[in-house]
Design a protein with these regions (language model features):
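Domain-scale signature associated with acetyltransferase and cell-envelope carbohydrate enzymes
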Residues: 1-112, 133-139, 146-148, 156, ...
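Alpha-helix termini
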Residues: 71-72, 129, 164
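Flexible glycine-rich beta->alpha loop in the catalytic core of nucleotide-sugar glycosyltransferases
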Residues: 109, 116, 153, 164-165, ...
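Flexible, gly/pro- and Lys/Arg-enriched active-site loops
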Residues: 114-115, 127
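Conserved catalytic-core motifs of eukaryotic protein kinase domains, centered on the activation segment
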Residues: 115-116, 121-122, 170-171, 189
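Glycine-rich NAD(P)-binding loop of Rossmann-like domains
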Residues: 123-137
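A generic "structured core" feature
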Residues: 147-149, 155, 159, 165-167
Length: 190
């Protein structure tokens, strides 16, 4: 009996996620964004800044709960096919953030392509932002609690361990497994 109830719950959650995905797709299409087929979302993402022809979602993308997308006027978010975003993910985009096909991002991850300047001649909060695009290659994985900062490039097939910080200075090899802060190569996918 328990297995049957678990099955019913899984079917309901899947249908609910697909329905919410259809509603999100309609919302994004109304704002000029491009969305492929099969979008699923466990809950609607929170948008800081309205989507305006600047979100591109491929086929069969799966969004978890409580995700936040901060978009500047010039920011562009691109999710290729079969991207999986778990829950509580913050994506703050001033320039461009691209997540390649078949990539996955675990819970509590922060991805930010911008930062303030740090001049002593002006108050910190009044300074302009600087930004560099972030590229997460296909078949990559980012584990829970990671922080991906501006200019980061995560190569194809790479995996980043929990609570790691990825910066533009970090060179990440294809299919490498990295962890720590500072980030270090600990193994290679075989």
């Amino acid at each position: 009996m328990i297995n049957f109830l678990t099955y019913i719950e899984a079917v309901w959650l899947n249908r609910s996620s697909r329905f919410k995905g259809m509603l999100l797709k309609l919302y994004l299409l109304m704002h000029g964004c491009k969305v492929g087929k099969g979008l699923k979302c466990a809950s609607f993402p929170y948008f800081k800044g309205f989507p305006n022809k600047n979100i591109f979602i491929g086929n069969y993308v799966d969004l978890g709960r409580n995700n936040t997308f901060e978009l500047s006027e010039n920011g562009k978010i691109i999710f290729d096919d079969y991207v999986l975003l778990h829950q509580n993910i913050l994506i703050s985009c001033n320039n461009q953030i691209r997540i390649g096909k078949f990539s996955a991002v675990a819970e509590n991850v922060s991805i930010r392509d911008g930062n303030h300047q740090f001049s002593k001649n002006q108050y910190y909060r009044l300074q302009d932002s600087i930004s560099e695009p972030i590229e997460i290659g296909e078949d990559a994985g980012i584990a829970a609690g990671c922080v991906v900062l501006m200019g980061a490039k995560i190569s194809k097939g790479a995996f980043i361990g929990s609570n790691s910080v990825i910066t533009r200075k970090t060179i990440i090899e294809e299919y490498g497994i990295y962890a720590g802060n500072p980030l270090k190569l600990i193994a290679t996918r075989k």
